[in-house]
Amino acid sequence: MSLIKKLPDIVANKISAGEVVQRPASAVKELLENAIDAGADEITLAIKAAGKTLIQVIDNGCGLSEEDATLCFERFATSKISDVGDLENLHTLGFRGEALASIASVSQVELKTKRYDDRTGTLVKISGGRFEEVSRTETPNGTAFSIRNLFYNVPARRKFLKTNATEYKHIFETVQAQTLVYPDIKWRFYSDDEEIFSFLNNNLSERLDYFFGKDFSQNLIEFTEENDFMKLRGYLGKPAMMKRTKNQQFLFINNRVTQSKLLSSAIMTAYGELLGEREYPFFLIYMDIAPHYIDVNVHPTKMEVKFDDERNIYNMVHSVVKHRIKTLDFSPNVQVEEKPDSPRPTGESFNFPGVAKRLSYNDRDADMRSSNALFRDYKTYYKAQDERAEPGFFANPKREMDWRSSLPAHTEASLTPPKQAEPEGNPTFHDGSRQMEIFIQSRDDEPATAGQERFVWQLHNTYILTQIKSGLLIIDQHVAHERILYERAIAVMESNVPNSQQLLFPHSAKLSAWEFDVLKEIKTDLVQLGFSLRILDQRTVLVEGIPPDVMPGREERILHEMLEQYQDYQQNLKLEQRDNVAKSYACRSSIMAGQKLSRNEMTSLIDQLFATSMPYVCPHGRPIIIKLSIEELDKMFGRS
């Protein structure tokens, strides 16, 4: 008896669905592409529960006959190609005939369709790959395709779906890309019975401004280039529009939403030194190329392509982009609103000295002992240097100090905010002409000493070098501050005592639809962190208060970046929600590499770093401190 058996179609389709339909957004993509291939110029998408309970696409395309309405659910049934040679002259988005069979096998499907010349339409109902009804029905011209309860019969697959906010973001990005590549189509998008957007005219600028912010399109550089076998057109972002993620990069090849490492590399290389560390440019590029020069049949989702002549394709894209960014004015267009400046926070009510909540670190006690020893090395060295300093060079009065009060605490301390300090006592971080309130406490019993001022340096406005008894410490200022803010955020949220700096002039922030969903998901933690937020409508939130670590005037930017960072961490790191919020906040609110600090700011940063429970690594695991001992330095210089 043979051990190898041919799988029934219904089983094969369920297995195939795991590759073709990875999440609700995959099903949305397939239905939208079918509507586009049908010649529709009006498409409506409606979802519920981020596509988990309902995905519905309605179009005014050519419709299907009764025979085709049932045949389209058969595996490898397609109207797009008839033999393999047709792939070299492909002008449609779909061609394999796999998607509908896969979708129908893992959901409950209802299809209503009618051709223009037919008197009545066709109704098809399928559940788990089995036909339940095929009948004639009254329906408008075009097609209405509904998918309910995706993966209802594949529990193992359904449990791996992400939160509604995450799945919604993927759907939003899918339909967003289609609206940009097909501006001539009228698009409507509804989520849980609320209209998200409605684009009823052929205006690409309107869509760009909706998705990315007011007047966004005015800061783009338009270009068009053409040669014998390819045409390039599109828009490039100015350096002032750089992002920390790649979610504002769009590449459309023959009107197909595509990802290409080759072309992305060509564009990034063309920007060259205009890009900072971990910065990505906006681009929206349309490539029209003869189908036989590309292969779109290389990935289950058809998101990747291969080129027949990669070198020439790369060189042309790189050359076009580089030429445009070298010859045009890249200064951003800025519109200034005349309104009173927001007040600057004063005092230190946001500091919580001595707080050391139990965080999930391995061997924490050993790390704390090591941290204490290194901190004692740093402090005792400066105390000894100060005692040996010649009198008269620094006129600061000397007082007896208790260095132990600066060591990391091992017990949970009170979260009562400390007494307000005089405003002039607050050190500040300088960022060009702007000043940010420092987040680091300067205790009255620990003034800067002569030794401290002499032995703290900033290297390339990125690293802090400080001399200790046993050698040299090198500290990354960004991740050091990130560690401080992370532990402070965790402590504040766990204390249930929000510490908010109220704004004299509240600021309204416009959110994208997915940002608004993320905001609703984490709003409680944001309030605990110190944000005072009032929702005005489904796209607008009023920021009335901010954590004291956020400079007034940057609240909207920080909020946008936090929501983006939170979503990125949620997808890639699978963090617990409160931990994710704290890490996103710390990452986006901390001082950056390249920011100049004063000596007082640097010594204060070091003091607070050593007051954390884990001063050696940032919340993401990057090293904060590198120590070079005298012995290691001696070896480098060949000293015996």
From Swiss-Prot:
Q: Which residues cross the membrane?
A: none
Q: GO: which molecular function terms?
A: ATP binding; ATP hydrolysis activity; ATP-dependent DNA damage sensor activity; mismatched DNA binding
Q: Which gene is transcribed and translated to give this protein? A: mutL
Protein family (similarity comment): Belongs to the DNA mismatch repair MutL/HexB family.
Please provide the Gene Ontology terms (biological process) for this protein.
Answer: mismatch repair
Which residue intervals make up region (Disordered)? 332-353, 408-431
Pfam annotation, one family: DNA_mis_repair
- Per its UniProt entry, which superkingdom is the organism in? Bacteria
Tell me which GO cellular component terms the UniProt record holds: mismatch repair complex
PANTHER family attached here?
Answer: DNA MISMATCH REPAIR PROTEIN MLH, PMS, MUTL, DNA MISMATCH REPAIR PROTEIN MLH1
The name under which this protein is listed is DNA mismatch repair protein MutL
- Which keywords has UniProt assigned to this entry? DNA damage, DNA repair
The record ties this protein, via InterPro entries, to:
DNA_mismatch_repair_CS, DNA_mismatch_repair_MutL, DNA_mismatch_S5_2-like, HATPase_C_sf, MutL/Mlh/PMS, MutL/Mlh/Pms-like, MutL_C, MutL_C_dimsub
Gene3D superfamilies annotated for this entry?
3.30.230.10, Histidine kinase-like ATPase, C-terminal domain (3.30.565.10), MutL, C-terminal domain, dimerisation subdomain (3.30.1540.20), MutL, C-terminal domain, regulatory subdomain (3.30.1370.100)
Q: What does this protein do?
A: This protein is involved in the repair of mismatches in DNA. It is required for dam-dependent methyl-directed DNA mismatch repair. May act as a 'molecular matchmaker', a protein that promotes the formation of a stable complex between two or more DNA-binding proteins in an ATP-dependent manner without itself being part of a final effector complex.
Q: Does the keyword Repressor apply?
A: no
